[in-house]
């Protein structure tokens, strides 16, 4: 029989959030072992439910959602997103500049496929949400990682960004609020990055899926709102803020000047048409979700589940000898650092695999987020405090075997 292998286009594509360690976790679950899965930010798995009005909308619109929609999405959803962008002070956004997708993930891949030729470069943060690096590679481009500095609240290193720009650089990706670090970028930093994009004719891709999940009185500033003269592609959605990750509701907004990117927009339209449309029934909940009461706010205030769980896991990490972390300002994740002077750890993937096998908890290693050293891992702080306390005990016990 003729042997078939995976496409060579996938040679440099990796997505370790659902990689080999997950495969081992699935094998263990199939054998009846109970695994606490902290590899993805999936609110429903931890008892978070969608707002009642969202479910009501879904039921009421089921019959009206049996056919295809416009490839960019239904009018009511795009209109609601346009109004949301106006409130956020996005410049020069019309309804035709908005694309609905089956989650942001689909749109990230589409945005890279429409832009890149072989050898083109995209600046991507390190650490990153690994789909960005994978999508660049799949499209034939090269992801060039710029450093985010843990000692400076995980903010992007401006000098490092400048040093990575070449004649092949087409764009820069900003993940703000950041996954996996929970960092939230101040306006002054965003303006510096916008100036770099302006001077080098770069497209800005802004992954802002956690913009409604900010804590401690901080405010998220959309990069597009500060860049009226720079073409920006902003990504957002409802998976996290409205606890409906399984519905797959994401959107992409084009803002700023567009005359010089007409060819790129033609490519986006072509790719959008090829997939016909995103899930029409899920699109029906966008208008209700973005208008009126935002129930996620209650989860992010003192006493709210996410707020209290974030505080607990941050303090718990500080109490484990040899671990440290920057306190997240937003999102669902914390990215602890392991002191390798205290612990013998040279392979972070093996470290989280061993933790899975011994303690039945699934984490993601730092290099799964394209971090350069084997000294970090990501924790999802969606479990309730009593479960997070168990993780603290398990990690404290587990680390003892690595002590120098």
What is each of the regions a protein language model found here?
Residues 2-6, 11-103, 110, 277, ...:
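N-terminal small-domain helix-loop-helix segment of the aminotransferase-like
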Residues 31, 139, 199-200, 230, ...:
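Helix C-cap/helix->beta junction micro-motif
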Residues 87, 162-163, 344-346, 354-363, ...:
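PLP-dependent enzyme catalytic core of the Aspartate aminotransferase-like
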Residues 114-136:
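Conserved PLP-anchoring active-site segment centered on the Schiff-base-forming lysine
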Residues 138-144:
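A short helix-loop-beta submotif of the ANL/AMP-binding
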Residues 144, 149-220:
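Active-site phosphate-binding strand-loop segment of PLP-dependent enzymes
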Residues 225-304, 314-316, 399:
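Conserved core segment of the aminotransferase class I/II
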Residues 287, 303-317, 325-339, 373:
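Conserved glycine-rich beta-strand-loop-beta hairpin in the small C-terminal domain of fold type I
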